[in-house]
């Protein structure tokens, strides 16, 4: 008798995706992050669902409803901080996953890569609208500053901003619609993630060498399920340590002050995972220029497959490209640091130089290094 998992219409889909999936035998722990992102998404949806049961999306009660969750709801504080720090873990996994894709040339699976960029943008949008919901000072001013950027669009900008606000300032209507967006977007992310997997399973996984591995495949289960479980345990352990020992480590103290339109915080800054993009935005003195640079800092990922000049897919055997890749990582860390600093000397110039280097590395230096390495292959 044939196994039910191979014949049942639903089980067959799961079997082909998680059990009998042929997987390269040499993929490293850098390939763990896909499943960890799935785990993060499930955790965020579940904790978010329980928070939504007690939260009220109204300017007069939003802040106190979050306080009520933390004080009066059974384990409400735990659910709230799991959700807040879960977002940080989500972005750590997301950036590691993208970094892996860049290093090993996974971006050559173009459909999978483009869906991935779309996923990144959707997750960033979800995190942004979610940060507005507690209705603290940083929530309010973050929403005001970031939505205001759209006013830089010529002709329709101001109308667009007022349309998003649902009025002439960030107010009740804005909070209500942001809650609606924050509730629906994770389900859109889930659907996109399914399409992401669908496209990935059309080609099969890449591997560290970047060489086709069709002649050496092993089943996903038990080899990689056990490896994914180890990764999941490490992720959960880190998240629990963060949540139970230092829940506010990555948050902003200003968000414990209720939103006040009449008092601007000294330093308006987003959560840590947006600081690199915020630094690029601030490094250009022109509003429209800054907005375009901000958009391009993420959308540049779409152009990476077109900028592949090397004959080798992976950076595993390309020392010049490796050096530039790690320079890019250092540059992104520098931008993250700058994004959290006040706008004054020497941070302004450091931010501008780091922003120039970011685009220079991706658009010019890395493709050039690929060409040089091609020449070296002939020696």
Curated annotation (Swiss-Prot):
Binds 2 heme b groups non-covalently. It is found in: Mitochondrion inner membrane. Heme b b566 binds at residues 97, 196. Heme b b562 binds at residues 83, 182. InterPro entries: Cyt_b/b6_C, Cyt_b/b6_C_sf, Cyt_b/b6_N, Cytb/b6-like_sf, Cytochrome_b, Cytochrome_b_C_euk/bac, Cytochrome_b_N_euk/bac, Di-haem_cyt_TM. The keyword Iron applies. The chain crosses the membrane at residues 33-53, 77-98, 113-133, 178-198, 226-246, 288-308, 320-340, 347-367. Pfam families: Cytochrom_B_C, Cytochrome_B. One of its GO terms (molecular function) is ubiquinol-cytochrome-c reductase activity. GO terms for cellular component: mitochondrial inner membrane; respiratory chain complex III. It is a multi-pass membrane protein. Keywords: Electron transport, Heme, Iron, Membrane, Metal-binding, Mitochondrion, Mitochondrion inner membrane, Respiratory chain, Transmembrane, Transmembrane helix, Transport, Ubiquinone. Its cofactor is heme b. A ubiquinone binds at residue 201. One of its GO terms (biological process) is mitochondrial electron transport, ubiquinol to cytochrome c. Component of the ubiquinol-cytochrome c reductase complex (complex III or cytochrome b-c1 complex) that is part of the mitochondrial respiratory chain. The b-c1 complex mediates electron transfer from ubiquinol to cytochrome c. Contributes to the generation of a proton gradient across the mitochondrial membrane that is then used for ATP synthesis. The cytochrome bc1 complex contains 11 subunits: 3 respiratory subunits (MT-CYB, CYC1 and UQCRFS1), 2 core proteins (UQCRC1 and UQCRC2) and 6 low-molecular weight proteins (UQCRH/QCR6, UQCRB/QCR7, UQCRQ/QCR8, UQCR10/QCR9, UQCR11/QCR10 and a cleavage product of UQCRFS1). This cytochrome bc1 complex then forms a dimer. Belongs to the cytochrome b family. Heme 1 (or BL or b562) is low-potential and absorbs at about 562 nm, and heme 2 (or BH or b566) is high-potential and absorbs at about 566 nm. This is Cytochrome b. The gene is MT-CYB.
């Amino acid at each position: 008798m044939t196994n039910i998992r191979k014949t049942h219409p639903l089980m067959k889909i799961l079997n082909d995706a998680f059990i009998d999936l042929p997987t390269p035998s040499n993929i490293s722990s850098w390939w763990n992050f896909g499943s960890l992102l799935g785990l993060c998404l499930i955790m965020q949806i579940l904790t978010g669902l329980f928070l939504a049961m007690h939260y009220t999306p109204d300017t007069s009660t939003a802040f106190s409803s979050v306080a009520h969750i933390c004080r009066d709801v059974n384990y409400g504080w735990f659910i709230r901080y799991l959700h807040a720090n879960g977002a940080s873990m989500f972005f750590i996994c997301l950036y590691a996953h993208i970094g892996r894709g860049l290093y090993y040339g996974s971006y050559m699976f173009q459909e999978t890569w483009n869906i991935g960029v779309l996923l990144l943008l959707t997750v960033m949008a979800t995190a942004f609208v979610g940060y507005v919901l507690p209705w603290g000072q940083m929530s309010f001013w973050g929403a005001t500053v970031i939505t205001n950027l759209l006013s830089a669009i010529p002709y329709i900008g101001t109308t667009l901003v007022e349309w998003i606000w649902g009025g002439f300032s960030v107010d009740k209507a804005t909070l209500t619609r942001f809650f609606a967006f924050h509730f629906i977007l994770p389900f859109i992310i889930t659907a996109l993630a399914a399409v992401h997997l669908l496209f990935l399973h059309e080609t099969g996984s890449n591997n560290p060498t970047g060489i086709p591995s069709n002649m050496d495949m092993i089943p996903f289960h038990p080899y990689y399920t056990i490896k994914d479980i180890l990764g999941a345990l490490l992720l959960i352990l880190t998240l629990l340590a963060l949540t139970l020992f230092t829940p506010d480590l990555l948050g902003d103290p200003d968000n414990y002050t209720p939103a006040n339109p009449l008092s601007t915080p000294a330093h308006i800054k987003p959560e840590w995972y947006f600081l690199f993009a915020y630094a690029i935005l601030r490094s250009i003195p022109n509003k429209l220029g800054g907005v375009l640079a901000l958009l391009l800092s993420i959308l540049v990922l779409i152009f990476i497959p077109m900028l592949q000049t090397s004959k080798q897919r992976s950076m595993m055997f390309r020392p010049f490209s490796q050096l530039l890749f790690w320079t890019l990582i250092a540059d992104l860390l520098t931008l993250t640091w700058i994004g959290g600093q006040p706008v004054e000397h020497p941070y302004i110039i450091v931010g501008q130089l780091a922003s120039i280097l970011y685009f220079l590395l991706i658009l010019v230096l890395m493709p050039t290094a690929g060409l040089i390495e091609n020449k070296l292959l002939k020696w």
